[in-house]
Amino acid sequence: MVNNPSKWAFVTAGVILAAIVAGMLLIRWRGVETNITAKTTSVGLIFVGKKDDASFCQAHYDALMGIKDELNLRVVCREKIPEGAACVAAIESLIADEGCKVVITASFGYGKHLVEVAKRHPGVCFIHPTGNMKRANLTSCMGRMYQARYLSGIVAGMRSASGKIGFVGAFPYPEVVRGINAFALGARSVAPGAQVYVRYSFSWVDDAAAQAASEALLAAHPDIDVFAMHVNSLMPNRVAASWGIWSVGYNKDNARSFPDSYLTACEWVWGPYYRQKILSWLRGKFHGDIDWIGLDGGIVRLSALTKNVAPGTQAAVDAAERRFASRGFDVFYGPVVDNVGVMRVPKGESMSDEEMLNRFSWYVEGVTVEK
């Protein structure tokens, strides 16, 4: 074979040209990213509790702190803002007084007031975690926490010797109801006779109310030996530790605070989601939506199992996670029967996202709600 110098010169020139173009595109891309973050963006965050609550509020605060330097953010918090008209004044203050161009309203009850505020401020990006409303400058996000709840139910069901499990919920909202149901289904998948007893505290953050609900459950059912919860209070974990029973946490992993009683936690991981949404706003590519993100999207997860779990628990959780990953299974695939014997989801069918998100008002078999 005879070499063709002109051919190879042409190929070499082509490679060099391609490299130059790629380099120019990379420089241009980096320039865009640098330009949109060169100016500090003020981000407002309001929630019903405190930023250091070791629970729901801190999960949001820590998420923003984790991306603050990369995106050149100034984070302004408004703590202990009630779910009601008072939130409007707090949001308006973040915009008018603090110059916030992104506002995150981290509680479900803010939603009914948020749409009107978003209409008045089209130049501001609004992000509503756990919400269910949208417009051009407003996006809501609900993680499929019920999937992590199902996994935590497996952990609780395998740990419970009595088959009696307590659950303290904040409000009978669809978000809380579907979590209780998923937890019960997970528990009963490994302990078919398991019973879940629920009491509502009617507050996200009131420690006294969470403690009263926890102690009332134990007074009524002294053989409860595992607690779980959907409140932004660590009180159910504290009560469990003081009574010498096990507990499952929520929002953040607090295993270090309860080394002898904690099993695992259903965690929120907001950082990557906030990063993506804030960048899309800065790039001018933001679209209001209602995002449903599951275990596969990384916004929810089950924290590492502690030394307190029953033998074989990790294998059972891993098997359930593989079922989720296969997309051939989700928690509310039929058959699902409610706690009065009515077939709610027939075999071969599944609940719609809309029903799970907005209209979940019944409880599955094995759940008893205490008055």
PLM regions: where:
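Extracellular/periplasmic periplasmic-binding protein-like sensory domains
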Residues: 240-314
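Hydrophobic alpha-helical segments within soluble ligand-binding/sensing domains
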Residues: 141-164, 266-285
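Periplasmic-binding protein-like
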Residues: 99-107, 127-129, 221-233, 248-250
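Extracytoplasmic "Venus flytrap"
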Residues: 43-63, 67-70, 76-85, 108, ...
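Flexible loop/hinge segments that line or gate small-molecule binding clefts
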Residues: 119-143, 252-260
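Segments of small-molecule ligand-sensing domains
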Residues: 286-371
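Extracellular/periplasmic Venus flytrap/periplasmic-binding protein
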Residues: 175-224, 229
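An alpha-beta-alpha
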Residues: 64, 151-198, 290-310
